[in-house]
């Protein structure tokens, strides 16, 4: 890419929507800096071990009509507690525990303020707690099928990791589609 063309196009876009363009440019830059690893560790014995598709924005009905705010990374084995989940980005554990929709979940906020959400876990890494610092690539738990009910509910859907990314956008919190970032990180497992 010719750097002059990129700068010229960036300046042209800023003219039409300067503040918003600058905000989202910073978000994209932060995501590129933050995300170092695919959130499911690579299998040593199999070429493929997970499957996923762009399901962000699809309709969900449990708990009322809503849109899907992440990407479901499915375990090909469909066995809970087998597939290790790792931190895609370093940061601080800011949420840990049960959510009716997400089951056992971990939320990690990066130093750039981006929130990474890992849901439906079977279990957590030993001794992990809110306030802990984690490094990108660090083991944080195992893929499961928890959620959609009272604390401890499991088995209502296949084993998978729901991976979500959220930003604070001045109005509140917005979900970002992680699919294309995950595609880019497939080799970094």
Residues covered by each model-derived region:
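Small beta-barrel nucleic-acid-binding modules, principally OB-folds
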Residues: 65-78, 107-114, 165-176
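Feature marks short, surface-exposed loop/turn motifs that line or immediately flank catalytic pockets
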Residues: 114, 125, 142, 147, ...
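Surface-exposed, glycine-biased beta-strand/turn segments
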Residues: 2-104, 136, 149, 187
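Short hydrophobic beta/alpha edge segments that flank linear recognition/processing sites
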Residues: 105-108, 135-151
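Zn2+-dependent peptidoglycan hydrolase active-site motif and core
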Residues: 86-130, 152-160
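Acidic, glycine-rich catalytic/binding loops that coordinate metals and/or anionic ligands
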Residues: 79, 130, 135-138, 142, ...
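Short amphipathic beta-strand/extended segments with alternating polar/hydrophobic composition
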Residues: 50-54, 63, 118-121, 172-185
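A residue-level detector for short acidic-glycine micro-motifs
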Residues: 75, 95, 120-123, 145, ...
């Amino acid at each position: 890419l010719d750097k002059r063309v990129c700068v010229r196009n960036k300046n042209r876009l800023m003219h039409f929507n300067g503040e918003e363009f600058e905000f989202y440019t910073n978000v994209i830059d932060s995501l590129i800096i933050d995300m170092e690893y695919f959130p499911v560790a690579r299998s040593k014995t199999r070429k493929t071990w997970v499957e996923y598709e762009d399901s962000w924005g699809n309709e969900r009905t449990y708990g009322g009509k809503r849109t899907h705010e992440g990407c479901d990374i499915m375990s090909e084995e469909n066995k809970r507690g087998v597939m290790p989940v790792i931190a895609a980005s370093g940061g601080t554990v800011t949420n840990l525990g049960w959510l009716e929709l997400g089951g056992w979940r971990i939320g990690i906020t990066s130093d750039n303020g981006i929130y990474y959400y890992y849901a439906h876990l079977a279990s957590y890494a030993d001794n992990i707690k809110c306030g802990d610092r984690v490094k990108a690539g660090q083991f944080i738990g195992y893929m499961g099928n928890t959620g959609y009910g009272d604390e401890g509910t499991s088995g209502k859907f296949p084993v998978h990791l729901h991976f979500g990314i959220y930003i604070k956008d001045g109005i509140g919190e917005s979900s970002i589609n992680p699919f294309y970032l995950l595609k880019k990180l497939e080799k970094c497992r």
